[in-house]
Swiss-Prot record:
Domain of life (superkingdom): Eukaryota
A GO molecular-function descriptor: chemokine binding
Membrane topology: Multi-pass membrane protein
UniProt name for this protein: Proteolipid protein 2
Organism: Mus musculus
Segments crossing the lipid bilayer: 25-45, 48-68, 85-105, 112-132
Gene: Plp2
Subcellular location: Membrane
Role noted for this protein: May play a role in cell differentiation in the intestinal epithelium.
Amino acid sequence: MADSERLSAPGCWLACTSFSRTKKGILLFAEIILCLVILICFSASTTSAYSSLSVIEMICAAVLLVFYTCDLHSKISFINWPWTDFFRSLIATILYLITSIVVLVEGRGSSRVVAGILGLLATLLFGYDAYITFPLKQQRHTAAPTDPTDGP
């Protein structure tokens, strides 16, 4: 039993780390880190009312990262994962844009201004994530036949 666990461990580790090297894995990891930094900036300000957006988006991105890393998305087939990921990133884009504009207009304190600027950066990051995960863009098309046709 110990030999089989030892032999399967590198395969499991390879499967878990292979997603983190993809564009989507790096993007999800960057979203988590950026949400954490924004959360720290909002927590350092006098009012931390806007920090809930960072917490929720960080948790959602971490859950999707775990699901994709452990290949759980292929085992749970009743959820349409591309649309789920697209709507998560689209909603985050809209909410970060609104929150950042409100915070920058209020402009009370340097940590809130930094959080607002980082929120605009998060808007771009989540918007890019929504762009690359748009499910209709990823549909495959069948190739046209290239055989010569008999004709005049």
